[in-house]
């Protein structure tokens, strides 16, 4: 499986993101560069303007920044952004980060 490095210091692995599978998200963006002591993955499913099943997950500090893994619980779009313990946000300049979730079946 591939890994995707996307803008803002974010890496997702594996891609494509598949329903029922685990996806690992690494973050070394604005909050990490600003010295955040803790970073949380804020994620949900659905269209960009109406997330469902929204959750916050503490990320673990690594030598590459921060990292967390989630099990993909939906067949809808995965959306995410990041916040630190002081409630500062990195939402990719208002665009968030987003992946289409695949069924895992070949067409």
Language-model segments: what does each one mean?
Residues 18-22, 75, 104:
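Solvent-exposed, conformationally flexible loop/turn segments
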Residues 32-73, 85-102:
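Aromatic-rich carbohydrate-binding modules that target alpha-glucans
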Residues 1, 84:
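Residue-level signal for pocket-adjacent positions within structured domains
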Residues 2-37, 45:
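A structural signal for beta-rich interaction modules in eukaryotic proteins
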């Amino acid at each position: 499986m591939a890994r995707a490095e996307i803008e803002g210091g974010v890496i997702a692995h594996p891609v494509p993101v598949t329903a029922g599978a685990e996806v690992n998200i690494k973050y070394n963006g604005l909050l990490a560069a600003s010295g955040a002591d803790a970073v949380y993955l804020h994620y949900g499913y659905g269209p960009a303007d109406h997330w469902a099943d929204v959750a916050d997950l503490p990320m673990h500090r690594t030598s590459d920044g921060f990292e967390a893994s989630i099990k993909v619980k939906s067949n809808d779009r995965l959306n995410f952004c990041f916040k630190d313990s002081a409630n500062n946000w990195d939402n990719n300049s208002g665009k968030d980060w987003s992946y289409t979730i695949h069924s895992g079946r070949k067409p």
